[in-house]
Curated annotation (Swiss-Prot):
Gene field: Tapt1
Modified residues (Phosphoserine): 520
List of residues that carry Phosphothreonine: 526
Domain of life, source organism: Eukaryota
Protein name as catalogued: Transmembrane anterior posterior transformation protein 1
Residues that bear N-acetylalanine: 2
Compartment(s): Cytoplasm, Cytoskeleton, Microtubule organizing center, Centrosome; Cytoplasm, Cytoskeleton, Cilium basal body; Membrane
Family label: Belongs to the TAPT1 family.
Signal peptide segment: none
Organism: Mus musculus
Length: 564
């Protein structure tokens, strides 16, 4: 039996030799686990067996090392900035522009403040002398005979009007009690004083914008040629309007100085801090607006005027405080930190404001040199032989700085704070006056030299020799072209020096002196025959582009920070 079984086993295996492996594989396939009792079955090695095994191992390795791989990728990941070279170069230039803004802005501010100082010193030094010379000519006119149809030149008439307005407003300011105003303001709450100070700033800008129009109307009405048809209310009403304006503006500046004095004398300095924080609110109102070059020039002029006015207000505050403490020099050192804090906050606000305005509007720092050249052009053109207007008036139109109200207030404060008694005191006053004249002359000489340099660097000499005509802005003048031809033989430097240093000669009667050159300053004094020409010129101006030259930007839109 055993032999049969043994013999049958190979027979079965031999008879089913071909099916043996399949049966074995099928049995193993049917019983993969072997009932769970035997050892783990071994898989048959087929095509792609090792590849699938490697995939499983890779998946298992990736699942285990995903965090390490992420960290290594983050630590070793690279990038190339060369793909955005233009963008990064532009960002770097913006940084460099912001770094240059403080230097360029302060150069403009420094030049502009000395321009305002020159116009301000003119009221105290040269204006009284010019008024004296005009009155002397008026008194001695019968000795020379009436060879001229005019008693006085237009510039002399304007000087006399300025002097009379200054004297009348000075005596009117004596009826305003500074001490009562100080105690009235000091009794108010801090928040109310803060609101009052903001209202005074707005009112000061409005007064400055409209005040020069009143003064220009007075000057033009008083000096208008008699041959032209007059359509105005007369010189006397314009004169009273000018006196009223200067008086009200002087009172407004006095209230500003009194409020600042109360802030200085407060115990906890809270009001002074609030008033300084008002400057930073100005950043919010200016930085996020769209500005062009002309608008920025306009705002820069306003900042120059505001900074110079603040300096004069601080001087008035120091004079009043020193008077209260009997001119004790120790008290000056008590005021010195507060004065420095106010000045530093003003400078910081201007720098931050201009830096971000130039950044957001893609304006380069070189634009401030153009602004400086434009201000220098005003100074040089006012020193020419036949200038259109006085220099102090050109500064008022350009920056909105009107020196008459501020001069009236300063004279009132100085005369009430300093008592002049004895011959020695009067001698000191005379020496101080001659010192002011020397300072004015020195300042004018330095400013004139620097202005000529800035005009040459900006290549604006041709505009000096061939200025645009004032009567017809849209048409070229044949007279200016004929005058410009013989000057081409000389060098520009010789022409510039000759035109600046030459004194104004006697004008003929047929030459009409024009006070204002802008189209918005035409008064109701034109003859009927010229009305059609003016309407045609106005229609031509409407079709022009909205952008203007920097030399045409004045203080007429300085409050709105916009240019039509």
């Amino acid at each position: 039996m055993a032999g049969v079984c043994d013999a049958a086993a190979p027979g079965e295996g031999g008879g089913g030799g071909a099916d043996g492996p399949e049966r074995t594989g099928r049995g193993e396939a049917e019983q993969p686990g072997g009932g769970g009792h035997g050892p783990a079955p071994q898989h048959t090695e087929t095509l792609g067996f090792y590849e699938s095994d490697r995939r499983r191992e890779k998946r298992r390795g990736r699942a285990e090392l995903s965090l390490l791989r992420f960290l290594s990728a983050e630590l070793t990941r690279g990038y190339f900035l060369e793909h955005n070279e233009a963008k990064y170069t532009e960002r770097r230039e913006r940084v460099y522009t912001c770094m240059r803004i403080p230097r360029e802005l302060e150069k403009l501010m420094f030049f502009g403040i000395f321009l305002c100082l020159d116009a301000f010193l003119y009221v105290f030094t040269l204006l009284p002398l010019r008024v004296f010379l005009a009155l002397f000519r008026l008194l001695t006119l019968p000795c020379y005979g009436l060879r001229d149809r005019r008693l006085l030149q237009p510039a002399q008439v304007c000087d006399i009007l300025k002097g009379v307005i200054l004297v009348i407003c000075y005596f009117m300011m004596h009826y305003v009690d500074y001490s009562m105003m100080y105690h009235l303001i000091r009794g108010q709450s801090v928040i109310k004083l803060y609101i009052i100070y903001n209202m005074l700033e707005v009112a000061d800008r409005l007064f400055s914008s409209f005040g020069q129009d009143i003064l220009d109307a007075l000057y033009w009405t008083a000096t208008e040629p008699k041959e032209r048809k007059r359509a105005h209310i007369g010189v006397i009403p314009h004169f009273f309007m000018a006196v009223l304006y200067v008086f009200l503006h002087a009172i407004l500046i006095m209230v500003q100085a009194t409020t600042l004095n109360v802030a200085f004398n407060s115990h906890n300095k809270s009001l002074l801090t609030i008033m300084m924080s008002n400057n930073f609110v100005e950043i919010k109102g200016s930085v996020f607006k769209k500005f062009e070059k002309n608008n920025l020039f306009q705002m820069s002029n306003s900042d120059i005027k505001e900074r110079f006015t603040n300096y004069v207000l601080l001087l008035i505050v120091c004079l009043r405080n020193m008077e209260q403490f009997s001119w004790n020099p120790d008290h000056l050192w008590v005021l010195f930190p507060d004065v420095c804090m106010v000045i530093a906050s003003e400078i910081a606000v201007d720098i931050v404001k201009h830096a971000f305005i130039t950044k957001f509007n893609d304006i380069t720092a070189d634009v401030y040199s153009e602004y400086r050249a434009s201000l220098a052009f005003d100074l040089v053109s006012s020193r020419q032989k036949n200038a259109y207007t006085d220099y102090s008036d050109s500064v008022a139109r350009r920056m909105g700085f009107i020196p008459l109200p501020l001069a009236v207030l300063l004279i009132r404060v100085v005369t009430s704070s300093i008592k002049v008694q004895g011959i020695l005191s009067y001698a000191c006053v005379i020496l101080f006056y001659f010192g002011l004249i020397s300072l004015k002359i020195l300042n004018s000489i330095v400013l004139l030299g620097k202005s000529c340099q800035y005009v040459k660097e900006a290549k604006m000499e041709e505009k000096l020799f061939n200025p645009p005509p004032a009567s017809t802005p849209g048409k070229p003048s044949s007279k200016s072209q004929s005058k410009g031809k013989p000057s081409q033989g000389l060098s520009t430097e010789e022409n510039l020096s000759a035109s600046v240093t030459s004194q104004p000669g006697h004008q003929k009667e047929n030459v009409i002196p024009l006070l204002v050159t802008s189209n918005s300053d035409q008064f109701l004094t034109t003859p009927d025959g010229d009305e059609k020409d003016i309407t045609q010129e106005n229609s031509e101006l409407k079709h022009r582009s909205s952008k203007k030259d920097l030399l045409e930007i004045d203080r007429f839109t300085i409050c709105g920070n916009r240019i039509d």
